[in-house]
Amino acid sequence: MRIGVDKNQLSGSHATSNAPKHRQRPDEVASLEPLRLPYGDYILIDDDVQSVLSTKLEPRKKDLIGHIKRSIDTKKDIPELWMDVTSDHERFKAELIKAKQDGAEFIVLIEDASVECLEDVFFYHRPEVVRSRFVRNKAGRLPAYIKVEHKQREIKGESLYRCMQTISTRYGVRFEFCTRRTAGKRIMELLNDG
């Protein structure tokens, strides 16, 4: 089994957070191949996708459009999903529209142990939190680092649940849930299940 992984999942901060997930698969069962995917994070490299890959030296995102049957987009937790359906909505919506126009099944896999099914999202709640961190003082004066505070907005499960229902109905998206420990195995199951 060959799995295409979006190159962004293998670089930067994603690389360290996704390393445990990528180690969950036995190497003799599945190999990961970095690709530029038009939507989602993981795809199954079947004969149709392989035909595109073998004709191009470095395939671009648009080369794979029309050849992907199922795509999995992973979210590390509920707050990341909340960000995608609120502040980062236009980018997320564009991905969903591309997948729907392409005729691909789009699955959002949320890696959060506090939620097991879509109905559990309704009861999810995270209060508003004020976080602080130290950043380098760009003015060049002392102190070298200054404390910066920012608010993380409250997440109401009821609102998120309604957004997810709308997305599911409008774009044909399927939401799946798992823990971080089982994410790699679950990705393989979802890609094989078709």
Task: Report the location of each language-model feature.
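Non-catalytic C-terminal interaction segments of nucleic acid-processing enzymes
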Residues: 1-67, 80-194
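Conserved catalytic cores of phosphodiester-cleaving nucleases, focusing on short active-site segments
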Residues: 70-76
